[in-house]
Amino acid sequence: TGSCCGPTFSSLSCGGGCLQPCCYRDPCCCRPVSSTQTVSRPVTFVSRCTRPICEPCRRPVCCDPCSLQEGCCRPITCCPTSCQAVVCRPCCWATTCCQPVSVQCPCCRPTSCPSAPRTTCRTFRTSPCC
């Protein structure tokens, strides 16, 4: 019970079940098992958590990387560098340039990029877009 977000709390503070910290600044924002919506801080009580998620971004800076659930947008500083799979939310993109990584729909590109949907992003030296 009580707020479980902040530098002095861990994922265990909000009922456990969080596999890893969400963001460096918000270590235990969690998604309830029964809920499919993003939970914003402060989280007052979560009996069980699945995968950790970040509070919604004010701007779509990057996609939800790696194993996090769809619908979470995190600041670029929170994105792990070891990620290969990227799960996107609408109007979020991992980077402004193409990366050789697989993406899942729905995914949208920067405004300067073509709108045609693709499942694989490749890097081209002559173009900053996918």
Swiss-Prot record:
Tissue-wise expression: Wool.
Assigned keywords, A-Z: Keratin
Keyword flag Transferase: no
InterPro entries: KAP (IPR002494), KRTAP_type_2-like (IPR052154)
Pfam families, alphabetized: Keratin_B2
GO cellular component term, pick one: keratin filament
Presence of the UniProt keyword Coiled coil in the record: no
Function according to Swiss-Prot or TrEMBL: The keratin products of mammalian epidermal derivatives such as wool and hair consist of microfibrils embedded in a rigid matrix of other proteins. The matrix proteins include the high-sulfur and high-tyrosine keratins, having molecular weights of 6-20 kDa, whereas the microfibrils contain the larger, low-sulfur keratins (40-56 kDa).
Entry protein name: Keratin, high-sulfur matrix protein, IIIA3A
Provenance organism: Ovis aries (Sheep)
